[in-house]
Curated annotation (Swiss-Prot):
Catalytic activity: L-aspartate + H(+) = beta-alanine + CO2
Record-listed Pyruvic acid (Ser) modification sites: S29
Pathway in which this enzyme or protein is active: Cofactor biosynthesis; (R)-pantothenate biosynthesis; beta-alanine from L-aspartate: step 1/1
Protein name as it appears in the record: Aspartate 1-decarboxylase
InterPro entries reported for this sequence: Asp_de-COase-like_dom_sf, Asp_decarbox
Length: 156
């Protein structure tokens, strides 16, 4: 029997959700509105990587389905020490993809607004380019600067 090689690939991402609550006394997990889970094709209890854009922290937990139409993204249990209301987070789920399919694999990428409402579905834009505020189909160059006045996009 020949083992099929696999690669761990991004399967789904919810980009820049706004955290609405944090409860250290809850047993654990990350509450996500069911509408976002369905849009991203993430299942309840699926493993999630949580990257806190605001604080720079990262953790792994699992998704728990919130109430319909609630827009609540809540850090529960120990995660509440690393994530606070108002933080922006990226939620990512991974899958093992057969090597033969890796080159054509396309993850499900969804982007949300500050109220955790779906704004659009993929594709992802590679840095140093950014989406235009007026039109998701147009790109602009990043104008962020380092403390010494150099463009942040250098070296991307």
């Amino acid at each position: 029997m020949v083992d099929t090689p696999y690669r761990k690939m991004l399967a789904a991402k919810i980009h820049r959700a706004t955290v609405t609550g944090a409860d250290v006394n809850y047993e654990g997990s990350l509450t996500v509105p069911p509408e976002l889970l369905v849009a991203a094709k993430i299942h309840p209890y699926e493993s999630l990587h949580v990257w806190n854009v605001t604080r720079g922290t990262r953790l792994e937990t699992y998704a728990i389905e919130g109430l319909p139409n609630s827009n609540d993204v809540c850090a529960n249990g120990a995660a509440a020490h690393l994530i606070r209301p108002g933080d922006h987070v990226i939620l990512a789920a991974y899958a093992m993809v057969p090597e033969a399919d890796a080159a054509t694999h396309k993850p499900r990428l969804i982007f949300v607004d500050d109220n955790n409402q779906l704004s659009h579905v993929g594709p992802e834009i590679a840095g140093p380019n950014l989406r235009s505020d007026s039109d998701d189909t147009h790109l602009v160059r990043s104008t962020e600067m380092t403390p010494d006045g150099q463009p942040l996009a250098e070296g991307c």
